[in-house]
């Protein structure tokens, strides 16, 4: 690979990139050149801030680690040929593993026929995916709107709730502290981290936040809103807060919130973008309490780690506000054939291989190991928690969490922090992780903590 001059034309740049895409292997000099090139382009054309962020998850502050390809269902290989067990899972997109052959085959077969829809003829895979989700999701959820990401699925849910509740004079939304629902304007209004919110103030009016897991605070907020005429259109929350640090609510919390929503005539929106698709040991985390939302948000793992897709699924009663004019909320690429093919294949793999049950089994194994390490290293680890294959290790301060991620990188295990909680390291591997790989992850974590304790003692 010849290095492009800084004055290279768009044609030359695209040809250079296509040449890279065609390559299956890199020699040593090509690898070094590619690493330098990627770092330069991130700095000059993407965002230099990403380079600083990457330093927290690479050994010795060397942020030249550049991914090259999947090494298997559960591993990644960088340009230097180093293979990493993936315990980050692209923030939860690789539930069925990297390049799952069933998902890849479905997308390739659809690509050979028609990659994107005409927008005028009826597209069969969108209809089939909507039917499949109606059969898969809990309760009376029946109609699906498709988009490209989690934040888009939340935006659609908020607009759907507004359209349904506006004639009833209900305009207020209640979200929870520590919540993360995305960064577009509506979703950001429900998100609860000031770092993400302050630069874009004022956000949408009518959003209130109450402590997550505190049912009396939820009741008080709903009651006060009713007294002041600010009746609540919907409550939006995550069954388990992912970016908040993998925060689990008390048992029965979702059930109690469902009852409050029914009592006050508010819709219940569950954001299962991160907890859905088998991640917590059930297909959807709300199924642990048999709770049925009015609107359900999905994305991330829905596309099988091959295609981006989001979905907003609602009951017929709620979704029917869009029947008269289906163009009130649409997106060009939402529900495209490639994405729907990936989602249908993903659902098939999850069910055929019973991956939610595997997530429960292997998640218990990993969590037991992490909790044992927490007992062995109380000076470093505050707590290990989680459900299924969504886990977190919380350290006593941010710096220790940073060092743990770096040490795990040296052990060839990929982990990272959460967006709303810097001292918490998230463990979110593919559900296809093998028992042997689970054992290797626990072993790597023990080595990492031992090395960190030595560093602390020497300091």
UniProtKB/Swiss-Prot annotation:
PROSITE patterns: AA_TRANSFER_CLASS_3. GO terms for biological process: L-lysine catabolic process; putrescine catabolic process. Pyridoxal 5'-phosphate binds at residues 150-151, 274, 332. PANTHER family: AMINOTRANSFERASE CLASS III, PUTRESCINE AMINOTRANSFERASE. Belongs to the class-III pyridoxal-phosphate-dependent aminotransferase family. Putrescine aminotransferase subfamily. This is Putrescine aminotransferase. It catalyses: an alkane-alpha,omega-diamine + 2-oxoglutarate = an omega-aminoaldehyde + L-glutamate; putrescine + 2-oxoglutarate = 1-pyrroline + L-glutamate + H2O; cadaverine + 2-oxoglutarate = 5-aminopentanal + L-glutamate. Its EC number is 2.6.1.82, 2.6.1.29. Signal peptide: none annotated. The keyword Transferase applies. InterPro entries: Aminotrans_3 (IPR005814), Aminotrans_3_PPA_site (IPR049704), Class-III_PLP-dep_AT (IPR050103), Putrescine_aminotransferase (IPR017747), PyrdxlP-dep_Trfase (IPR015424), PyrdxlP-dep_Trfase_major (IPR015421), PyrdxlP-dep_Trfase_small (IPR015422). It comes from the Bacteria. Its cofactor is pyridoxal 5'-phosphate. It is an enzyme of class 2 (transferase). Catalyzes the aminotransferase reaction from putrescine to 2-oxoglutarate, leading to glutamate and 4-aminobutanal, which spontaneously cyclizes to form 1-pyrroline. This is the first step in one of two pathways for putrescine degradation, where putrescine is converted into 4-aminobutanoate (gamma-aminobutyrate or GABA) via 4-aminobutanal. Also functions as a cadaverine transaminase in a a L-lysine degradation pathway to succinate that proceeds via cadaverine, glutarate and L-2-hydroxyglutarate. Keywords: Aminotransferase, Pyridoxal phosphate, Transferase. The modification N6-(pyridoxal phosphate)lysine is found at residue 300. HAMAP family: Putres_aminotrans_3. GO terms for molecular function: diamine transaminase activity; identical protein binding; putrescine--2-oxoglutarate transaminase activity; pyridoxal phosphate binding.
